Amino acid sequence: MLPVKLTEANYPAVIELWEASVRASHDFLKPEEIGFYKPLVLKYGLPQSDLYGIYSNSVLAGYIGIRGQKIEMLFIHPDFFGQGIGSQLLQFAVKQQNCTLVDVNEENPRAHEFYLKHGFKLYSRDEKDDSGQPHPILHLTLL
């Protein structure tokens, strides 16, 4: 399965996947916080990133958002967790798009470990996320 370029026409499927993934993997977020972030992802996150997705039997299984050399987002639908789709998308971003940077929620150790396993290292930490919420962000780089 190769990543394909996603467009604005794919946003409904992308945001549905985003929400399912966040609900399954971001247990530190309250439901109202997910409601706070969702319109921000739609308004700023998706349009400001180059999006690529992997489909399985015509279903969007995962996607990655890239801006410059930074991975802005990588989300996998819970039905496809543990099947290597995240690794495929990450390798595509690193090898084909020359990505070397990513931010990850400190409260999401599974994601942090995923990036460490793929060679990323911590270079800085912020106490709050980009929207000022008290969710620490780890800034990682590929060495």
Please give the residue ranges for each predicted region.
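Conserved GNAT acetyl-CoA-binding A-motif
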Residues: 95-107
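Conserved GNAT-fold acetyl-CoA-binding loop/helix
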Residues: 16-42
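A short, internal acetyl-CoA/4′-phosphopantetheine-binding micro-motif in the GNAT/acyltransferase core
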Residues: 70-81, 105
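Conserved beta-hairpin
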Residues: 49-62
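Conserved catalytic-core motifs of GNAT/GCN5-like acyltransferases
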Residues: 103-105, 121-137
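A short beta-loop-alpha structural element at the N-terminal edge
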Residues: 1-16
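Conserved acetyl-CoA-binding loop-helix of GNAT-fold acetyltransferases
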Residues: 82-95, 113, 117
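Conserved GNAT-family N-acetyltransferase fold
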Residues: 52, 64, 69, 74, ...
